[in-house]
Amino acid sequence: MASTLPPQTWEAGYARPADQASWEAETNYVAESGERAHWMLPVHTEPPTSTIGNGLGLTHLRTWPSIYDGTATGKPEWFKPSKEVDVLICGAGPFGLELGLILARQGISFRIVDKANAPCLSGRADGVHPRALEQLHAWGLAHEVSEEGPILNSTVLFRNGVKLFHGFSSTCDSRYKGIHIITQGQMERIYIRDLLRHQIVVERGTTVQHFNVQSTSQDHPVRATLKNVATGEEEVVRARYLIGADGAASSIREQLGVEFDGITTDIYWAIMDCRFKTDYPHILGFNIIISAEHGGSIVIPREDGYTRFYTQINGEKARKLQANRQARRNASTVGETRIDDHGITPDEVLEQLNKIIAPHKVEFASPMSWFSVWRVSERVARHFSSPDLRVHLGGDAAVLGAFGLNSSIYDAANLGWKLGLVLRKHAEPSILTTYDKERRLFANRVIRCSGAYLRFICNSSLPLAALRDLGEHLESHDENLPLLDGSTEADREFLYTFFKRHAMFLLGVEWPIVNSAICPADTKVRASSLRNGVRAPNPRVCLATDYTAYLYDKMMGVGRFHLLLFGSDLQGPVRQRLAVLAGELRKREGFYERFGGREMFNLILVVKTLSHQTAELLEGDLAPLKDHATTVYDDRAPDDDAHYWYGVNHARGALVVVRPDLAVGVSVWPEEIGKLNKYFASFLLECEETLPTKKSLLARLWDAL
């Protein structure tokens, strides 16, 4: 929400205005006997949501410090942080909080510290991709996030008064379809409440003063000194891993000595969240309005009648901002990105906006919810992980320029399960090398893709940032930059080629593929049409006679592999292939039991039978599937069922291994047990209880003789 909501009542069964909110009434906490309720109303405050207002003032947003501000309001009685933890997270922005959510769900011990005394209250990030919501769904949080604000349904693009595009916004086959609007502050509050349920409190006003990694043979090789900003008190904490989630000017990244490749531009954007009065006809959709003379503007509809305007600052105003920036001393190697002493007022930005949007007019219709000025920086850390794999970077500490909130979700989803498996002694530490490889190539594409589009909106001929590949060489690419020759034909051609190439990437459902142990190279003949490493599709299925949903609804959690076994109608030639896999499930030395059983594998049987037919068909040679698998019913028409989405041969079936981050690992025929063993043995550790003892090993040798 952009401001404190007025009092409401639900006495009629729906929300409507009230004179007073019942939670505020003293009588709501006293019994008829006069005895007071045991539960006490927490202290709340209503701070302003912006440091700078407009002529109508500032909005305020009610917040609850004892819920959201962590140790800044005191430590709960039950909170007793350990001096030895599995993971120490430096930074409680989106990435740090998201990684914490994943670790908490795996029972991993961690502490999370942040130098700020409170989370983000308003503004900053403005939307989440469908793919990001799919990750949040696996964590159990997507419904809350997706229902906060509107979804972007329409897109309008004007350049120099010419309408280049007016139509539906890009969508994909995800259940979440398109971009959902929500601010960073709303997201952080959702995350913090979740961590409280897991007995985790953000330690506020605290920094990692310095750290070192001692002998990696030690159980907790990371030694970090925490410092309380207010008192100066220091504490030494030991951890197995350290996470740099401390933003663009990351002290963890700088202590590691990791280069932050890229450029800091002289392109400035002012951002205003407010209610506006305007005669511009497309205010309720996503808009890009470009003036070759005055710059660009981006319009994003928000919740409760608010709108966000991004307005490019150019000309004399930009030179003034540049002078202010240069007058400040800044020790960060990145330079300033957010400009706090703006040197420009909301009224001046509104004046600039009206020049861009002319002949239409825009006026403030409410106090300011959020105002900020940002300088565009396009950077990617040269390495996301330290050579010893004990320190990892994510979020803005790793990539800066675009996709910030969404990239943080993808970073956390990628790193979280790998860290969890290593710490739970299910995987080799070498699996952590794949985090840097997979996420860094994604980050490079983010910077190239968003950079090209930014130059189109801002009418800039600035070259794209030069970034490293997975080695030490500059990455080669074929990203097209706009011609900017003033012709409508060139503009339309750029937009056509840009969105043809990047539409699905901009929704998060497509990304660069990096081959590794967890994502082996594709073979010419595959059991599924899906390529290794891509997003696992999420078709509709039937879960029970009276319940339909999506396949992902049976793929919840963060620390297990999902084994999707496609069995057609369980009859004919596919049955004997399924029987081979079913027999493997019973073997103690088989891959399923050897690498963790139910703790590591979520086996889902996808069948083309109806529920009343299935029980009998799962007798006999397929009986182990009934004991080990969750059955879902693929009863949609052949042109829209899960077998079609996954490209499965009904006579042969398929087993698709889906990683905990919902990407395809590998697909095999159901009878290819050797390939499954080889795949999992390349990075997983055998469970101790399944390892043969010396006695049993000798017994086997004796039997062999």
Swiss-Prot record:
Cross-referenced Pfam families: FAD_binding_3 (PF01494), Phe_hydrox_dim (PF07976)
Effect of deleting the gene: Abolishes the production of azasperpyranone A.
Highest taxon, organism lineage: Eukaryota
Keyword field: FAD, Flavoprotein, Monooxygenase, Oxidoreductase
Cofactor(s) recorded in Swiss-Prot or TrEMBL: FAD
Recorded metabolic or biological pathway in which this protein acts: Secondary metabolite biosynthesis
Keyword Oxidoreductase (UniProt): yes
The EC number(s) this enzyme carries: 1.-.-.-
GO molecular function: FAD binding; oxidoreductase activity, acting on paired donors, with incorporation or reduction of molecular oxygen, NAD(P)H as one donor, and incorporation of one atom of oxygen
Record's note on what induces expression: Expression is induced by the azasperpyranone cluster A-specific transcription factor ATEG_03638 which is itself regulated by the azasperpyranone transcriptional regulator ATEG_07667.
Binding residue positions for FAD: 86-115, 208, 308-310, 408
Gene3D superfamilies xref list: 3.40.30.20, D-Amino Acid Oxidase, subunit A, domain 2, FAD/NAD(P)-binding domain
Biotechnology note: Azasperpyranones display potential anti-cancer activities. Azasperpyranones A, C, D, and F exhibit potent growth-inhibitory activity against the A549, HepG2, HCT-116, and HL-60 cell lines, with IC(50) values of 2.39-14.42 mm, respectively. Moreover, azasperpyranone D significantly inhibits HCT-116 xenograft tumor growth in BALB/c-nu mice. In addition, azasperpyranones A and C can bind with four kinds of therapeutic targets for cancer, eEF2K, FGFR, survivin, and TNF-a.
Keyword Oxidoreductase annotated: yes
Family: Belongs to the PheA/TfdB FAD monooxygenase family.
Its biological purpose: FAD-dependent monooxygenase; part of the cluster A that mediates the biosynthesis of azasperpyranones, members of the azaphilone family that exhibit anti-cancer activities. Azasperpyranones are synthesized by 2 clusters, A and B. Cluster A is responsible for the production of the polyhydric phenol moiety while the azaphilonoid scaffold is produced by the cluster B. The non-reducing polyketide synthase ATEG_03629 produces 5-methyl orsellinic acid, which is then reduced to 5-methyl orsellinic aldehyde by the NRPS-like protein ATEG_03630.
Name of the molecule in the record: FAD-dependent monooxygenase ATEG_03635
Organism of this sequence: Aspergillus terreus (strain NIH 2624 / FGSC A1156)
